[in-house]
UniProtKB/Swiss-Prot annotation:
[4Fe-4S] cluster 2 binds at residues 145, 149, 152. The gene is rimO. One of its GO terms (molecular function) is 4 iron, 4 sulfur cluster binding. Residues 131-360 form the Radical SAM core domain. Its cofactor is [4Fe-4S] cluster. This is Ribosomal protein uS12 methylthiotransferase RimO. The keyword Nucleotidyltransferase does not apply. Signal peptide: none annotated. NCBIfam families: 30S ribosomal protein S12 methylthiotransferase RimO, MiaB/RimO family radical SAM methylthiotransferase. GO terms for biological process: tRNA modification. Residues 363-426 form the TRAM domain. Keywords: 4Fe-4S, Cytoplasm, Iron, Iron-sulfur, Metal-binding, S-adenosyl-L-methionine, Transferase. Gene3D superfamilies: Methylthiotransferase, N-terminal domain, Nucleic acid-binding proteins, tm_1862 like domain. It is found in: Cytoplasm. It comes from Thermosipho melanesiensis (strain DSM 12029 / CIP 104789 / BI429).
Amino acid sequence: MNFYVEVLGCPKNEADCALLKSHLRKMGNNIVDNLSDADAVIIDTCGFILDAKKESIEEILSYVEYKKGKNLKVFVTGCLVQRFGKELKKEIPEVDGWFGVLPPKEIATHIGKRNVIPEVPEPVYNFEGRVDNGQYAYVKISDGCDRACSFCTIPLFKGSFKSRKIDDILKEIEFLIERKIKEIILVAQDTTGYGIDIYRKQMLPELLKRINDLSGDFWVRVMYMHPDHITDDIIEAFSYDKVLKYFDIPVQNGSDKILKLMNRSRKTRQLYSLFEKIRNFYSDAILRTSIIVGFPGETRKDFDETLKFIKEVKFDRLGAFIYSDEEEASSFSLSGKVPREIAEERLEELMDIQSQISFEKNEKLVGKKLKVLFDEEEDGVLIGRSYMDAPEIDANVFVRGEFKKGFFDVKITSADIYDLEGEIVEE
């Protein structure tokens, strides 16, 4: 059977589907890049917030419409199914199979035979091969979450925090290096908590050391670091040659009152100290964060505190989102809901400030050299990234030329608000 795989949602889904494709191939199937060549479609969904749910449902419905009059099967898997499986099966009976949060091998084994939506999510797995395109790959080191952020529903459909064994992760990374993958991106709900459940201590520093010891020309990026777990040992582990000094630390807000309502344990003064410590360790550290605006109870004063926080820290990269009022989240019962139009205005105001910070930082890069990895070519322009940018969520470096694999030194010739332009420095 020819399978076309559509991946929605976060990079953890990308990692899961890379393994799913490998298991499907081992069972005698083919993975196709064109929908017109497919006998079956697998849609891996996201069920985190309202916008993600809408996108997933719209995609499912579009494939259901597409398959009319065709000999095409549509299968749906992932977080949306784990969270709303019963309702989905009732509302969209045209789907040929539903699978919740399961190891990819389980999905490949049961697809076309029966639905599998486990009572207890099973988000981690053992490595047995994967299929990737491009020069970067996401590697899931753990999944699930034991925290209780009031706005978050992830523990409901991903379950408790579970780490993979370190040797299994290294086996997967060695597999990727052998296949010339140049950027290994470690993902989890909280990468800094890696190992606490199975080794009874934080193992991210040890994991980074052992990855760094592997031979090959590649670099390592760490995503989703919860500020509560960031120790000096973790910060020091970013000194390894192959580990990028890129710190993705979602703080969610800059008001102590709102942080308390979010059930986040760190106060802003502690967050300031953390970011100051990282920059004292590494003058070239890139700080990335995420901010939620419009949280219940957020007043103009609270929002101004967040703006002050952003202006003072001057994050290199920042993503901001409007609060999504999820019925199963404890924040759903909070009073003081912020009207959508006010939240949208605050989001725009915040991003205006961040764009100024970003442009000022980018201007300072003009004339300097950056090591760049190219992801694709479009109309004679190479689209790449330096150590400062993760795929899809951050900025790009644009260079005229034909696609090249590997790392290249690029001299920056001009700067935009977020993106850079440059030219390859010939040796």
